[in-house]
């Protein structure tokens, strides 16, 4: 959530920065905001005036009673009672206004950082760098590559069974390919915990509405979530804040560790990681990536989260991007790093880098990780703070990133390590997790 003081100080500048984001969405009803702000100021000025009058009358009452002027004192008491009634009404209306302003701000995305390229969609994203084990460009396989579906089905990918069990955009894995998927997740966790200093966490896969509000998925993106309905004899209607949802990413529970907390400055940075399934309805993606594992309702991901001092968040963004890159480099997978433009960034991000891995069968790069600095946007919603050197509570900055998406990494391994006979060579770094196995045979 944006700092309302920033909007009060320079609304025009904030709106101009918001206008660079994805259109035609209206992020802030400026007229409604200004009307509420005007009413708030009027009420606050009137409140201060009434409080001053009440204080003066209270003093007069004591003086009048001391002089024995009982009738005048009673008249002053009546005035105080009338002022109290008006103050109570003003306080109620002020609470309503503050609630309306908070609801309005909850739908407004983060302001893009000044270093973010301006553009309306992904065509304006800027390539930062690329890497390949064989030079700047991905190597040719020397034969016409198969995509991961044609490769994977003989090896244990079963899309028909996924449809049978759950519907479209679900996948079943069996045998060696299921083990390779598990090996990738274990390898990613080991890299992030043993080499990059993250603390591994096991988290619930179901969270409450307050957790999703804190990280920005609610209320704006409820349509992208899977709600969980509690069953059994105690399945009673629940209030909105007690509604449960399947996690769309472990960013949600990990970042909420610090909700309503005040950390010591010495505790920063907090570096957390978790391997979880993620559940997304993929609303609005009808007809996109319907073949294979690229866009699923359920997929696994190793997530990285950092909670940092505000002065360190852009250093942390670069560091986390390198942490995600390290996994791809160890796997020998060609990739490029893209700086997302203002129109392509997520709701809570001030700046985002996407890592895109090379897929030979598509002859293109596809997103495999997204690393974002949310600055204080989530922390303000979460009331996540630390005690600074001056002893004052200050909002932390939060960052999150994939380290990596496991299913898409499996896709990249299958396509980049395929052999002409349809078998797949297992990357050397994964072989210890595969019992020394070097190949997935057809």
Curated annotation (Swiss-Prot):
It holds the Pfam family tRNA-synt_2b. GO terms for molecular function: ATP binding; serine-tRNA ligase activity. Belongs to the class-II aminoacyl-tRNA synthetase family. Type-1 seryl-tRNA synthetase subfamily. It comes from the Bacteria. Pathway: Aminoacyl-tRNA biosynthesis; selenocysteinyl-tRNA(Sec) biosynthesis; L-seryl-tRNA(Sec) from L-serine and tRNA(Sec): step 1/1. It catalyses: tRNA(Ser) + L-serine + ATP = L-seryl-tRNA(Ser) + AMP + diphosphate + H(+); tRNA(Sec) + L-serine + ATP = L-seryl-tRNA(Sec) + AMP + diphosphate + H(+). Consists of two distinct domains, a catalytic core and a N-terminal extension that is involved in tRNA binding. Coiled coil: none annotated. Catalyzes the attachment of serine to tRNA(Ser). Is also able to aminoacylate tRNA(Sec) with serine, to form the misacylated tRNA L-seryl-tRNA(Sec), which will be further converted into selenocysteinyl-tRNA(Sec). SUPFAM superfamilies: Class II aaRS and biotin synthetases, tRNA-binding arm. It is found in: Cytoplasm. ATP binds at residues 280-282, 367-370. Gene3D superfamilies: Bira Bifunctional Protein, Domain 2, Serine-tRNA synthetase, tRNA binding domain. One of its GO terms (cellular component) is cytoplasm. It comes from Acidovorax ebreus (strain TPSY) (Diaphorobacter sp. (strain TPSY)). Homodimer. The tRNA molecule binds across the dimer. One of its GO terms (biological process) is seryl-tRNA aminoacylation. Its EC number is 6.1.1.11. The gene is serS. L-serine binds at residues 249-251, 303, 402. This is Serine--tRNA ligase. Its main location: cytoplasm. Keywords: Aminoacyl-tRNA synthetase, ATP-binding, Cytoplasm, Ligase, Nucleotide-binding, Protein biosynthesis.
